[in-house]
Amino acid sequence: MPFTSEIISIILLAIGLSMDGFSVSLGLGMQQLRLKRIAYIGLTIGFLHMLMPLAGMLLGQVISEQIGQWTSFAGGVLLFLIGAHMFFSAFRLTEGFRWQPVGVGLWIIAFSVSLDSFTVGLGLGISGVQIFVTLFAFGIVSCFLTWLGMLIGRKVYRFLGVYSELLGGSILCGFGIFILFS
């Protein structure tokens, strides 16, 4: 994949992965958090959106040496399945328990919205993507979208909440299909 199209794909993937954090931050924004707390939450989520896929990529590279030619196919299928899960989970009828974004609760929130980044990192590690560029994009985009979500969350959570998860899942599915057929 040429470098420019890889960058565009990585940015789109970063946006897709960050939609979980964006959705959660829309809800957190309704708690009237101070700007300092909003900044800290965004940085924490951005950090874990870099750390989790790094762990997945490293494991994915080890696995790719073992399974050879099937690596791109496996990575594409994995990304598609994650996106499909994210897309369909947007249709849940019940609202789950929400942790408060302080101390351990903040790390649990950040970990839960970053967990899908680990499995995406696994798929990307198998496909041999540029690690530094990918991690940087994941961290920056997730941090920015978390901040943005908290700042606008007070006014539009009920309108965008479900749609942001649908969009994120669609982007992941599309990226998985792109890898499968390229």
Swiss-Prot record:
Transmembrane segments: 7-27, 38-58, 71-91, 106-126, 131-151, 159-179
GO molecular function per UniProt: manganese ion transmembrane transporter activity
Keywords: Cell membrane, Ion transport, Manganese, Membrane, Transmembrane, Transmembrane helix, Transport
InterPro entries: Mntp/YtaF, Put_MntP
Gene Ontology CC, one term: plasma membrane
Main localization, broad class: membrane
Highest taxon above the source species: Bacteria
Compartments (UniProt record): Cell membrane
Chain segments annotated as coiled-coil in the UniProt record: none
Pfam families listed in its UniProt record: Mntp (PF02659)
Membrane topology: Multi-pass membrane protein
Keyword hit for Kinase: no
Free-text function comment from the UniProt entry: Probably functions as a manganese efflux pump.
HAMAP family reported for this sequence: MntP_pump
Similarity annotation: Belongs to the MntP (TC 9.B.29) family.
PANTHER family: MANGANESE EFFLUX PUMP MNTP-RELATED
Name this protein carries in UniProt: Putative manganese efflux pump MntP
